[in-house]
Curated annotation (Swiss-Prot):
Similarity annotation: Belongs to the CRISPR-associated endoribonuclease Cas2 protein family.
UniProt keywords, alphabetically: Antiviral defense, Endonuclease, Hydrolase, Magnesium, Metal-binding, Nuclease
Protein name as annotated: CRISPR-associated endoribonuclease Cas2 1
UniProt record, GO biological process: defense response to virus; maintenance of CRISPR repeat elements
Enzyme class: hydrolase
UniProt cross-references to InterPro entries, sorted A to Z: CRISPR_associated_Cas2, Virulence_VapD/CRISPR_Cas2
Record function comment: CRISPR (clustered regularly interspaced short palindromic repeat), is an adaptive immune system that provides protection against mobile genetic elements (viruses, transposable elements and conjugative plasmids). CRISPR clusters contain sequences complementary to antecedent mobile elements and target invading nucleic acids. CRISPR clusters are transcribed and processed into CRISPR RNA (crRNA). Functions as a ssRNA-specific endoribonuclease. Involved in the integration of spacer DNA into the CRISPR cassette.
Subunit structure: Homodimer, forms a heterotetramer with a Cas1 homodimer.
Keyword Glycoprotein among record annotations: no
EC number of the protein: 3.1.-.-
Cofactor(s) named in the record: Mg(2+)
Keyword Magnesium carried by entry: yes
């Protein structure tokens, strides 16, 4: 992968298959802090490089590498995500940029 400015937000789809219900709940609660729930075990997120790394690190600490699976699909620059998404059925709403309170 090429070098990416860490402050440039990208749109991600994060999908996971977690074998243990307790770990699944921990992953779900973590993901609520990083993105918008789309459907069972699927979130959409707008993340800069630092938040992507932080999210991946937390998820890595929660999952069992032998039985669980987390996919982070980079859809590209967040401002252009509408061009890359096709939705069937219920309308897909892209995640708008929101102010972050630190």
């Amino acid at each position: 992968m090429g070098t990416r400015r860490s402050n440039a937000e990208h749109a991600y789809v994060v999908a996971y298959d977690i074998a243990d219900p307790k770990r699944w709940r921990q992953v779900f609660k973590t993901m609520k802090g990083y993105g918008q729930w789309v459907q069972l075990s699927v979130f959409q997120c707008r993340l800069d490089g630092g938040r992507r790394i932080a999210m991946a690190s937390i998820l890595e600490s929660l999952i069992d590498r032998e039985t669980d699976h987390v996919l982070m699909l980079d859809l590209g620059p967040a401002e252009d995500v509408d061009l890359a998404v096709e939705s069937l059925g219920k309308a897909f709403e892209t995640l708008e940029r929101q102010a972050m309170i630190i």
